[in-house]
């Protein structure tokens, strides 16, 4: 279980607080108004944003003092951050070793991840030679090779059209289900939450609300969510 215990996150005048528990292998969408702190929450879980107070715990272990690389977390950002001078294979390999000095078993892991995201045969292409959807798949492959227990998605597919975005969300859901990965995904689109998430965490007015079942929450939103949805 991922436990966010009495979190208190502060950045200048910004403040976010709350407590939440997320079961292992659960899929959770994080929604709320722009600027509410959705991305900041993911950064705190990953270790990029320090906490003013509180704890991040995974399976009972306190991760709060751990550096990002020491946490069982992989994160995919809005910009996939592919290196333009590197091939798909080389970009994916960065998820294992920034120096790309891979052992044979690690190289096999890279090949398997590339195939799993549907880029088999495109290993030697560079990002400029890929479509937007293929670039998203390459970035996802780099995350997969890390083989972490928690996957954080900060709207990595926001720039894709509806059909491609749905395709990527379905792929993520398949992969996380296959591997028992806990997923947290920031989204501005309630339809994305319905498509991929079992539960929703609402962030609004400085408050982190505990997870609630997706369809029940979106079909009968509380006041804090109603304004955001325009319901």
Curated annotation (Swiss-Prot):
Top EC class, one word: translocase
Location of the protein in the cell: Cell inner membrane
Family the UniProt entry places it in: Belongs to the ABC transporter superfamily. Thiamine importer (TC 3.A.1.19.1) family.
Organism field: Ruegeria sp. (strain TM1040)
Complexes and interactors: The complex is composed of two ATP-binding proteins (ThiQ), two transmembrane proteins (ThiP) and a solute-binding protein (ThiB).
InterPro entries per UniProt: AAA+_ATPase, ABC_SmlMolc_Importer, ABC_transporter-like_ATP-bd, ABC_transporter-like_CS, P-loop_NTPase
Positions annotated to bind ATP: 32-39
Function comment: Part of the ABC transporter complex ThiBPQ involved in thiamine import. Responsible for energy coupling to the transport system.
One of the Pfam families matching this protein, by short name: ABC_tran
Gene encoding the protein: thiQ
Keyword set, alphabetical order: ATP-binding, Cell inner membrane, Cell membrane, Membrane, Nucleotide-binding, Translocase, Transport
Reaction catalysis annotation: thiamine(out) + ATP + H2O = thiamine(in) + ADP + phosphate + H(+)
Residue ranges of domain ABC transporter in the record: 2-230
GO-annotated molecular function: ABC-type thiamine transporter activity; ATP binding; ATP hydrolysis activity
Residues passing through the membrane, by range: none
Name this protein carries in UniProt: Thiamine import ATP-binding protein ThiQ
Gene3D superfamilies reported for this sequence: P-loop containing nucleotide triphosphate hydrolases (3.40.50.300)
SUPFAM superfamilies (alphabetical): P-loop containing nucleoside triphosphate hydrolases
One Gene Ontology term, aspect cellular component: plasma membrane
EC number: 7.6.2.15
Membrane topology label: Peripheral membrane protein
């Amino acid at each position: 279980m991922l436990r966010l215990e009495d979190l208190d996150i502060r950045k200048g005048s910004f403040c976010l607080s709350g407590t939440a528990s997320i079961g292992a292998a659960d899929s959770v969408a994080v929604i709320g108004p722009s600027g509410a702190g959705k991305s900041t929450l993911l950064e705190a879980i990953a270790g990029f944003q320090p906490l003013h107070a509180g704890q991040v715990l995974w399976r009972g272990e306190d991760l709060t003092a751990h550096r990002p690389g020491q946490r069982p977390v992989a994160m995919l950002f809005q910009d996939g951050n592919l290196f333009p001078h590197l091939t798909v294979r080389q970009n994916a390999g960065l998820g294992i070793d920034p120096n790309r000095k891979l052992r044979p078993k690690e190289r096999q892991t890279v090949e398997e991840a590339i195939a799993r995201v549907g880029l088999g045969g495109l290993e030697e292409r560079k990002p400029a030679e890929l479509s937007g959807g293929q670039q998203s798949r390459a970035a996802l492959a780099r995350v997969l090779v890390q083989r972490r227990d928690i996957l954080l998605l900060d709207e990595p597919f926001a720039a894709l059209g509806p059909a491609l975005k749905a395709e990527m969300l379905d792929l993520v859901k398949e992969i996380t289900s296959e591997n028992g990965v806990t997923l947290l995904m920031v989204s501005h689109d309630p339809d994305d939450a319905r498509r991929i998430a079992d539960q929703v965490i609402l962030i609004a007015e400085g408050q982190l609300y505990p997870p609630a079942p997706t369809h029940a929450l979106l079909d009968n939103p509380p006041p804090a969510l109603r304004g955001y949805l325009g319901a």
